[in-house]
């Protein structure tokens, strides 16, 4: 057994013996000529480069085989900035270069070796760090490992044979200045002829005299590095050290080295080395790279001599220090000395002597021999080579030590603040003032201003708190009331927040506390902090936490919302996505434990609880949002009691809580997904909560079996809203191609066939996920939750994904939510209008409907407080505005004040979004890529009150500028130069206007005058600008001006620049473009910007639109708009014509009253009823051109005549004459549906007719004429499908049996009246002139979707027949059709039911002895000779106005049976009563008791110009009462009644036999007292008017109903949806469930080790379950005891122990939890049991019966009191 040990020792000794010399012969001096060239360029466009070329001599003296001394002599460099036709490595004649000396120290340095491999470099302490790194770059070329000292075990390894020459292939972990990474070695013998013909590669072929020539190739893999210096900010979270260079990332790096050696692989001489390092930049906005930085370093052996003199004496040796291995090192840029952060010497991977010791010391550098991956997670958190100490990070008053960026190391490796030659503070002040002046003067080019702002922001980032104060004092010397002072403040304010440093935050905090910023300005500023901060250290966050708790925040409007949200976002960014920040530069910025984050979350949770205690809905919403934004698992336990109904909250707030869990679900879908699923599965929960939950659950990518369950359940779920949300979400995801949803999309395709085929209207809850084929915008995410009291959604969220997505969140997010639209409408209506007259009238005389509600004693339901929010979030900032009724009152009051007084609204702001990555190149200088997206917005609008008060005038100025800077290159610290290549894009839009408005309410006229707000001068003013400028440059870092002003800047022009100009009036468009061929002006103007927006087109282009300012006076725009409405009734009825008169000569003048009257006459001719609406608009530039443009449009719908008419008139006139006229009139004769008569509907094919006349020319009467006639009808295929459908056959069978089903026949009647075919015939006098357009229209129809649209045309008869995939559904209340998808013939049986659901409108039908409610509840009813209320509105407790019903909804419908097997129906509209009855075989009408004869065409009742209602006789003889004012339609045939009510007005706002119209059929039997009855006859009797001569069963049933059990309306019932495990607690639930509780607890204990399963949160420490129960109790001071509760004469005990705090501890946090109680009568026995329990006994009550349930506040954890 001792043999292996002895052998190992012998091998160790053998290795220690210097049996070979590797590359260096002791006492020899080697001289290598050094050549370095580094260039950058946008070479995808043109091979134009900027950079430097260096040369010098590296002299190496070999002191021993483990020690070299070196010196770099005669270092020189030259600038290169030119086109190199053969690429970056082209040869440049020396005479064309102007060399300068590099200011190096020239001091010698030492190189330590081990087995021929460089281990450490030692330099004089005073040598600048930039020089050290450059020398490391040069010396690193001599790093060669021919013996596999650092080899990695790999299957591809080929070990060299003992015979010479031999080849080898292996991988090694090798360090260079660019990092310690995996290197692929390929060693091959070099042919002899190459050595003879390539003196550049083998300059001394005779040295040594024996051996062979070898070529050593090295390929560096930057994806597998153990050590790499890197600074990045704003990049995708996946861009870490290990994978930053992977393909398709922003930056990819390649390094290859060719070395030629002579000798053997054990003893050789390095003849030459050539290293090429290429860094390619591919911004996320590009499909291909835009450019590359190239670097080549060559070392060529020049001499080999014996050492003649020594460079180091004792003094020099005492001053040297180790700088570690070859990896780039950093210094303190703010220190006068170097203060280098020194790395460790390189460790040999395979040295037996050292592996046992050194690798243990530095285990994070170890590399698994079984894997080629070199990633190390520990280095990510605790990297020993981080560039800044933790102590400096804690001082938020200090400027950050940001490595590798120009302003921090550009001055000889120091911050530019250290320069003695430049007063950098003064440069900053000058730059700030320049920006302030430029944004004041509109004539300046703002593209330069934005670049100056970026430079200022970057410069301020290098400052400490004292320097910030100096800048503040400088700005304060300007009067803030002046424009210059105001602009200087805006510039400083925004630059400070975008600096994102500790001193910047302290400055902002001081502004807030001193009142320098407040209100909305302060709120906006705080919202930008988490978007801009670069170093959110724990102390930074602590300081922010103190701020949000201070009174200056909590008691200041807007700020008290913005600050907690900004803090929450900062928590998320720091703790959830920490690698977004430069953790590889500063180390992990978050705390290892969770103590602090727990403290922060607890504060937010406490504030939420405080909001509930204060009943402050704004505060509640704010902290729901804030908790959600943190995306921390702890928020689950915070929301738990509210979501489970243990603490009171509104359904709106529960919906927000579910929405707030979305960010967490994206990070830990397996944790949050089950919670969403359980919320969705609770059918007793509000549909708003369920819709939100299921949409977000689907996005968590659940298991296939669960997704199948969700899809299948849409066939059984009673909520159409929830089913709509499921179906729309799945259908959208099916079509998405986003990589992150690929797996989910495949699952959705698999389950789509299980989904209910029913299609849902647009206003149902929906989820849409849309992809964009665009290089910028990637997709759109939309979530909508429908409202119960309006067509508009209650909740809307829209997220826009783009290349600028920030921390996994969409680039832009907008949304809103409101608890009740009806409350909003009532409140705004109350505030905007005076109710005094109406209330006085209501007090003196209540309406019929209000009296009815009083008589029935209808109780209004308890309304929740009005609440809502508006949301906006982007990469620049965010805004969340929660509101309640008080905020709406304030907003309306502010708007009134704004419109009735002189006011000004103004905003000036800079915004910026940036991404940065920087790392050392193999040359030893930093590579830098920066992406900047600055935006400047300046907007101002003035309101000036005029006479009369309806007149206004003012100024509207808007300036929007944006800039995209994509720049890459390198820094040369020794000469303060930044070598840059890049592409800049600029966009500017300016709108300077003056306006005057006048509103004439009496004449219904609105007049607007607009003219440019530009001073008259002889110069032109820019309005828009767009440019793309690729360039190369060399810029001095002290030059803070734009690179376009730099003399060294050269645009990258690929061909001759084409210049074009197009002028139109005062406007001029100028184009400069770099194109490969000459293009037309029109093409450049129209397509130039769109082409340039393509990521592959980065060519030079400029497009400018200018305005000639001397023509300002001529550019006044006048717009005049007049609106009119005329009601058609008997008094103004026009002469009767069966058809619309299409031929009429109209007055052509602007704002012509005669023309409007003539159009009214044309539209109303022959109609019995209707309201004609006319809009007249004229547009002119009277001082610039003579032409005036007139647009007039009119329309009317006549319910009585069943006609819809339109009239369009357009003319161009000048100099009192018409130049061009167009007139189009159209009439549609539509057929009324017969909702109560199926036989008529199925036997009479529905058909609508259309006739349109288009005239155009000099005048309408003398020009061309086109006549279009058409119709809409059922195609034979659709007709056949309907007649043979199961629903139609079933209805026919039931009618024949005399058992007509209301539900079945209603659907069959509705579907029998849809249309799907359009027929058109065109008759034109000049047909040949329109033939081309005609064919284009047909082609468009076919092109749109040939597989769906069946388009047939007959050119000879000019006929078009279109059968489309949609059917037109006639509506009873709306002016035109709804649309539904038509099933194909192959789907007729499976899909016809879907069509039935789509065409059916919500209605209530009273049949012979049944009622079908609005919510589709069918039940038996017997009215008898007693009035029953079918439908009535009732007071909604609107703002405490008792018994008040808005005038527009004072509606009731009553019915009773009569003797002749018929019914009387009473329709109440306001104070009008319409009685419908059957007398003999005729239907009669009485209005307010007066009989009214209904003419054949119907009857109309109006009040002035307002139609109250109309009565129309339908084709089957039934009567239809239509009231568009009240939004209700009643259809009556003498026996049956069908009601249609406007959902926006009456949904969830009615009572009666028709139900409450809330989309739930289970609560339709709701009595006036808000009780639910089970027996329909008793329910119906509660709405019987028993006090009005009531005969029938109603009185007795009403008596029974009053004695029946009152079942309260079931509120939404919450259930336990969050388990202890999901809430992060030890599992205490289910103690009595099953037979294996102990095993289950054990299993849970094992699982709890994983906590929430998310390493980012360090949940292992925070999970309260620990590994077992005892650990939990010990850690959180928890003890379990049986609780005793005394209730009257009972003593109750909890059946399971309840957690409590140990003695001398107090609860840190509590949550409510329900426990079962076992109760005993109070006696001696129970009192004794109580005493023993209180003394600590633990009797087993688990098998005892449960008598009561009680809530206990149980502690989650306890701490010392």
Curated annotation (Swiss-Prot):
Feature: compositional bias, Low complexity: 366-378
Residue ranges, compositional bias (Polar residues): 345-356
Claim: Disulfide bond is one of the keywords in the record: yes
Domain of life: Eukaryota
Subcellular location: Secreted
One Pfam family from the record: VWD
Gene3D superfamilies in UniProt: Lipovitellin, beta-sheet shell regions, chain A (2.30.230.10), Vitellinogen, superhelical (1.25.10.20)
InterPro entries recorded: Lipid_transp_b-sht_shell, Lipovitellin_superhlx_dom, Vitellinogen_b-sht_N, Vitellinogen_open_b-sht, Vitellogenin/Apolipophorin, Vitellogenin_N, VWF_type-D
Disulfide bridge positions per record: 181-225, 1404-1554, 1426-1590
Glycosylation sites per record: 383, 560, 615, 1284, 1342, 1345, 1460, 1668, 1724
Chain's role: Precursor of the egg-yolk proteins that are sources of nutrients during embryonic development.
Protein name stated in the entry: Vitellogenin-3
């Amino acid at each position: 057994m001792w043999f292996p040990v002895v052998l190992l020792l012998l091998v160790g000794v053998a290795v220690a013996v210097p049996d070979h010399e590797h590359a260096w012969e002791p006492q020899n001096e080697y001289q290598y000529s050094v050549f370095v060239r580094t260039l950058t360029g946008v070479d995808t466009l043109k091979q134009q480069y900027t950079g430097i070329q260096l040369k010098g001599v590296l002299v190496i003296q070999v002191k021993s085989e483990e020690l070299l001394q070196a010196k770099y002599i005669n270092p020189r460099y030259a600038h290169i900035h030119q086109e190199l036709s053969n690429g970056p490595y082209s040869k440049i004649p020396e005479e064309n270069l102007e060399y300068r000396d590099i200011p190096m120290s020239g001091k010698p340095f030492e190189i330590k070796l081990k087995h021929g491999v460089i281990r450490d470099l030692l330099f004089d302490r005073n040598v600048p760090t930039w020089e050290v790194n450059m020398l490391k770059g040069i010396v690193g070329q001599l790093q060669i490992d021919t013996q596999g000292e650092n080899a990695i075990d790999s299957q591809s390894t080929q070990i060299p044979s003992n015979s010479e020459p031999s080849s080898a292939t292996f991988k090694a972990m090798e360090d260079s200045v660019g990092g310690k990474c995996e290197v692929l070695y390929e060693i091959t013998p070099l042919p002899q002829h190459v050595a003879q013909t390539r003196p550049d590669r083998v300059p001394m072929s005779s040295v040594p005299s024996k051996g062979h020539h070898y070529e050593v190739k090295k390929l560096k893999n930057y994806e597998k590095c153990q050590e790499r210096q890197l600074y990045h900010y704003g990049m995708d979270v996946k861009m870490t050290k290990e994978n930053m260079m992977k393909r398709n990332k922003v930056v990819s790096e390649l390094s290859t080295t060719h070395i030629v050696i002579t000798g053997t692989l054990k003893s050789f001489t390095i003849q030459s080395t050539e290293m090429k390092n290429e860094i390619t930049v591919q911004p996320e906005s590009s499909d291909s790279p835009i450019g590359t930085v190239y670097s080549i370093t060559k070392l060529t052996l020049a001499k080999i001599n014996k050492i003649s003199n020594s460079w180091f004496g004792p003094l020099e040796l005492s001053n040297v220090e180790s700088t570690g291995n070859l990896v780039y090192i950093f210094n303190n840029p703010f220190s006068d000395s170097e203060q280098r952060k020194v790395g460790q010497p390189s460790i040999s991977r395979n040295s037996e002597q050292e592996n046992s010791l050194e690798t243990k010391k530095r285990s994070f550098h170890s590399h698994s021999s079984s894997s080629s991956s070199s990633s190390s997670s520990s280095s990510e958190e605790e990297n020993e080579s981080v560039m800044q100490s933790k102590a400096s990070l804690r001082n938020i008053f200090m400027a950050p030590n940001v490595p590798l960026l120009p302003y921090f190391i550009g001055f000889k490796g120091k911050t530019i603040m250290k320069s003695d030659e430049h007063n950098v503070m003064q440069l900053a002040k000058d730059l700030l003032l320049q920006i302030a002046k430029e944004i004041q003067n509109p004539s300046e080019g703002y593209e330069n201003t934005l670049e100056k702002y970026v430079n200022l922001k970057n410069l301020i980032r290098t400052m400490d708190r004292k320097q910030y104060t100096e800048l503040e004092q400088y700005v304060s010397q300007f009067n803030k009331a002046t424009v210059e002072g105001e602009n200087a403040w805006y510039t400083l304010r925004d630059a400070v927040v975008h600096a994102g440093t500790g001193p910047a935050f302290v400055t902002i905090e001081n502004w807030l506390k001193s009142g320098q910023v407040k209100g909305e300005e302060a709120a906006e500023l705080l919202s930008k902090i988490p978007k801009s901060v670069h170093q959110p250290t724990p102390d930074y966050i602590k300081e922010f936490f103190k701020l949000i708790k201070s009174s200056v925040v909590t008691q200041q409007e807007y700020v008290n919302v913005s600050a907690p949200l900004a803090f929450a976002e900062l928590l998320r960014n720091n703790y959830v996505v920490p690698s977004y920040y430069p953790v590889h530069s500063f180390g992990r910025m978050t705390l290892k434990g969770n103590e602090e984050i727990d403290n922060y979350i607890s504060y937010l949770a406490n504030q939420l609880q405080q909001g509930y205690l204060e009943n402050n809905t704004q505060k509640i919403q704010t902290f729901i949002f804030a908790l959600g934004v943190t995306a921390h698992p702890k928020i689950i336990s915070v929301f738990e009691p509210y979501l489970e109904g243990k603490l009171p909250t509104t359904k709106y707030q529960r919906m927000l809580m579910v929405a707030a869990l979305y960010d967490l679900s994206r990070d830990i879908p397996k944790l949050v997904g089950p919670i969403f699923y359980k919320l969705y599965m609770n059918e007793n929960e509000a549909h708003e909560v369920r819709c939100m939950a299921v949409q977000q659950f689907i996005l968590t990518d659940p298991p296939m079996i669960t997704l199948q369950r969700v899809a299948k359940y849409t066939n059984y779920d009673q909520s159409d809203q929830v089913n709509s949300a499921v179906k729309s979400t799945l259908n959208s995801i099916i079509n998405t191609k986003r990589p992150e949803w690929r797996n989910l999309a495949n699952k959705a395709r698999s389950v789509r066939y299980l989904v209910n085929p029913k299609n849902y209207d647009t206003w149902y809850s929906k989820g849409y996920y849309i992809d964009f084929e665009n290089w910028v915008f990637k997709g759109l995410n939309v979530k909508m939750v429908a409202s119960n009291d309006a067509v508009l959604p209650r909740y809307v969220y829209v997220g826009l994904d783009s290349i600028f997505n920030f921390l996994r969140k969409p680039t832009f997010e907008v949304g809103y939510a409101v608890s009740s639209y009806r409350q909003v409408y009532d409140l705004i209506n109350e505030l905007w209008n005076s109710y005094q007259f109406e209330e006085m009238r209501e007090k003196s005389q209540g309406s019929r409907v209000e009296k009815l509600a009083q008589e029935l004693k209808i109780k209004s339901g308890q309304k929740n407080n009005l609440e809502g929010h508006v949301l906006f979030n982007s990469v620049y900032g965010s805004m969340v505005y929660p509101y309640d009724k008080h905020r709406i009152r304030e907003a309306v009051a502010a708007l009134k004040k704004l419109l009735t007084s002189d006011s000004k609204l103004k905003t000036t702001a800079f915004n910026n979004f940036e991404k940065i990555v920087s790392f050392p190149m193999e040359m030893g200088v930093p590579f830098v890529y920066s992406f900047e997206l600055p935006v400047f917005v300046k907007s101002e609008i003035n309101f000036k009150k005029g006479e009369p008060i309806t007149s206004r005038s003012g100024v509207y100025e808007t300036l929007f500028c944006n800039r995209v800077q994509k720049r890459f290159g390198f820094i040369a610290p020794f000469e303060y130069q930044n070598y840059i290549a890049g592409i800049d894009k600029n966009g500017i839009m300016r709108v300077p206007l003056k306006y005057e408005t006048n509103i004439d309410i009496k004449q219904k006229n609105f007049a607007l005058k607009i003219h440019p707000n530009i001073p008259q001068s002889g110069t032109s003013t820019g309005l828009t600008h767009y440019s793309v400028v690729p360039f190369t440059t060399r810029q001095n870092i002290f030059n803070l001006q734009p690179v376009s002003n730099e003399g060294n800047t050269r645009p990258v022009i690929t061909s001759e620049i084409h210049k074009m100009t197009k002028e139109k009036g005062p406007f001029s468009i100028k184009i400069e473009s770099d194109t490969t061929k000459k293009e037309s002006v029109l093409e450049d103007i129209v397509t130039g910007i769109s082409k340039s927006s393509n990521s592959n087109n980065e060519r030079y282009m400029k497009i400018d639109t200018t305005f000639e300012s001397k023509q300002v006076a001529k550019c006044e725009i006048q717009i005049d708009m007049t609106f009119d409405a005329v009601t058609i009734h008997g008094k103004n009825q026009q002469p009767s014509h069966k058809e619309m008169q299409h031929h009429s000569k109209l007055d052509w003048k602007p704002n012509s009253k005669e023309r409007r009257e003539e159009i009214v006459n044309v539209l109303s001719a022959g109609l019995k009823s209707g309201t004609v609406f006319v809009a007249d608009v004229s547009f002119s530039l009277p001082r610039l051109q003579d032409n005036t443009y007139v647009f007039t449009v009119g329309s009317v719908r006549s319910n009585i005549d069943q006609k819809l008419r339109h009239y369009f008139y357009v003319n161009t006139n000048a100099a009192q004459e018409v130049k061009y006229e167009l007139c189009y009139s159209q009439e549609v004769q539509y057929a009324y549906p017969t909702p109560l008569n199926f036989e008529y509907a199925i036997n009479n094919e529905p058909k609508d007719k259309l006739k349109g006349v288009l005239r155009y020319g000099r005048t309408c009467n003398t020009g061309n004429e086109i006549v279009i006639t058409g119709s809409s009808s059922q195609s034979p295929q659709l007709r056949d499908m309907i007649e043979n459908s199961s629903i139609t056959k079933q209805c026919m069978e039931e009618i024949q049996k005399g058992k007509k089903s209301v539900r079945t026949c209603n659907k069959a009647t509705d579907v029998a009246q849809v249309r799907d075919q359009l027929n058109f015939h065109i008759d034109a006098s000049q047909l040949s002139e329109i033939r081309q357009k005609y064919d284009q229209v047909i082609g468009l129809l076919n092109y749109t979707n040939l597989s769906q649209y069946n388009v047939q045309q007959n050119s000879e008869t000019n006929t078009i027949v279109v059968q489309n995939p949609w059917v037109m559904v006639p509506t009873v209340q709306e002016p035109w059709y709804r649309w539904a998808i038509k099933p194909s013939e192959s789907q007729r049986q499976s899909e016809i039911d879907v069509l039935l659901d789509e065409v059916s409108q919500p209605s209530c039908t009273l049949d012979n002895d049944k009622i079908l409610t609005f919510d589709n509840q069918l039940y038996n009813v017997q009215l008898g000779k007693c009035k029953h209320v079918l439908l009535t509105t009732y007071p909604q407790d609107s703002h405490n106005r008792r018994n008040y019903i808005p005038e527009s909804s004072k509606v009731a419908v009553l019915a009773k049976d009569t003797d002749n097997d018929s019914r009387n129906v009473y329709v109440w509209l306001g104070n009008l009563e319409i009685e419908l009855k059957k007398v003999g075989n005729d239907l009669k009408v009485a209005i307010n008791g007066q009989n009214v004869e209904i003419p054949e065409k119907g009857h109309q009742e109006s009040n002035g110009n307002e139609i109250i209602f109309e009565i129309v006789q339908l084709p089957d003889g039934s009567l239809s009462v239509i009231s568009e004012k009240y939004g209700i339609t009643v259809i009556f045939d003498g026996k049956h009644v069908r009601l249609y009510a406007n959902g926006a007005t009456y949904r969830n706002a009615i009572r009666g036999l028709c139900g409450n119209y809330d989309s739930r059929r289970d609560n339709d039997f709701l009595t006036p007292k808000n009780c639910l009855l089970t027996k329909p006859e008793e329910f119906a009797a509660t709405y019987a008017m028993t006090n009005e001569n009531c005969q029938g069963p109603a009185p007795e049933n009403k008596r029974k109903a009053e004695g029946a059990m009152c079942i309260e309306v079931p509120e939404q019932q919450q259930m336990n949806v969050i388990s202890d495990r999901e809430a992060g607690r030890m599992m205490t639930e289910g103690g009595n469930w099953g037979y294996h509780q102990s095993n289950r607890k054990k299993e849970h204990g094992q699982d709890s080790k994983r906590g929430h399963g998310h390493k980012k949160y360090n949940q292992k420490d925070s999970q309260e379950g620990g590994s077992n129960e005892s650990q939990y109790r010990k850690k959180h001071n928890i003890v379990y005891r049986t609780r005793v509760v005394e209730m009257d004469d009972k003593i109750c005990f909890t059946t399971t122990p309840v957690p409590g705090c140990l003695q001398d501890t107090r609860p840190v946090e509590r949550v409510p939890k329900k426990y079962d109680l076992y109760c005993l009568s109070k006696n001696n026995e129970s009192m004794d049991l109580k005493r023993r329990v209180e003394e600590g006994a633990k009797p087993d009550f688990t098998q005892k019966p449960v008598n009561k349930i009680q809530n206990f506040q149980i502690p989650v954890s306890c701490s010392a009191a």
